[in-house]
From Swiss-Prot:
GO terms for cellular component: extracellular region; host cell plasma membrane; membrane. A motif (RxLR-dEER) lies at residues 48-63. The keyword ATP-binding does not apply. Belongs to the RxLR effector family. Secreted effector that completely suppresses the host cell death induced by cell death-inducing proteins. It is found in: Secreted; Host cell membrane. The RxLR-dEER motif acts to carry the protein into the host cell cytoplasm through binding to cell surface phosphatidylinositol-3-phosphate. This is Secreted RxLR effector protein 153. It comes from the Eukaryota. Coiled coil: none annotated. The keyword Secreted applies. Keywords: Glycoprotein, Host cell membrane, Host membrane, Membrane, Secreted, Signal, Virulence. Glycans are attached at residue 45.
Length: 275
């Protein structure tokens, strides 16, 4: 019995010693923690490197991440969400009472231009109607001005814009076709057909032609430049008829300068119309 107790005591003492020496001490724990902070790494050249995985490195990484994300976060914060448009009577709105006088004025000007265009269409319908209107002083520039007024005072593109452009181009082509003889050698006026047309006019129409001719004669006799004549919208066709009535084409050599001036004026007038 004593032997058994003695053996059991030795066994217990031996077991306690084994457990005591196998347990890690505080110093060994601290040492292992320090060693664990040094992680072995290998770079691309095969060189063994040690990287400290401590709190300082973690703090540096956090700061770098914060600096990288901060500009994006600030940009998101500065981005303005588009506000929903609120309908209001702005300065350019039709509901603004300040714009009503201007709109009424535009409507009146458009109506007046439309009436004038309608009268011209009625007046220039027929075989000799365009010639009569031209003898009374109708010019491509006056028709161009009327066309531009309709386009300008219309709130949107006119529904008959293509028709207005077509009639205008047709008139311009017919008008300047009367000057082909002016550039021949020797130049001819070909004005006889217009004189016959005037003789067949009604008395009131002949009065209108005479008044238009007198106006052109007064302006031309003042010796204005070509630019000034264009600004006054002197009819090239009436200018041609005026030169013919003065006998310029009967003696071309003596009136060469007057003919050249008329040619230059017709060319400049045509360029101005086509601008």
């Amino acid at each position: 019995m004593r032997n058994r107790a003695f053996l059991f005591g030795l066994f217990f003492i031996e077991y306690a010693c084994l457990v005591l020496f196998a347990a890690p001490t505080r110093a060994s724990l601290l040492k292992s923690n320090v060693e664990s902070t040094l992680a072995e790494q290998w770079d691309s050249n095969g060189t063994r490197t040690l990287q400290a995985d401590d709190s300082k490195r973690i703090s540096a990484e956090e700061r770098s991440m914060e600096q990288a994300l901060l500009p994006g976060a600030e940009a998101m914060g500065k981005t303005k969400v588009p506000e929903k448009a609120v309908p209001r009577a702005s300065l350019g709105s039709k509901l603004n009472p300040l714009n009503w006088p201007k709109r009424i004025w535009y409507k009146l000007r458009l109506w007046y231009a439309r009436v004038r265009l309608y009268i011209l269409k009625q007046k220039t319908t027929g075989e000799n109607a365009i010639g009569i209107a031209a003898m009374e002083g109708l010019t491509p520039l006056s028709l161009k001005k009327l066309k531009n007024e309709i386009f300008h005072y219309s709130s949107s593109e006119p529904h008959d814009k293509w028709l207005i452009e077509k009639d205008y181009n047709s008139f311009v082509k017919h008008y300047f076709s009367q000057f082909y003889g002016l550039y021949q050698n020797p130049p001819v006026s070909e004005i006889d057909k217009w004189n016959i047309l005037v003789e067949e006019m009604l008395p009131l129409e002949r009065i209108a032609v005479r008044m238009a001719m007198d106006r052109v004669g007064r302006i031309v006799d003042k010796g204005y430049s070509i630019e000034k004549l264009i600004s006054l919208d002197v009819s090239p066709l009436l200018y041609l008829r005026l030169m013919d009535s003065k006998g310029v084409f009967e003696n071309v050599k003596e009136n060469k300068d007057a003919i050249e001036h008329l040619r230059d004026y017709v060319e400049a007038y045509h360029k101005n119309v086509m601008m």
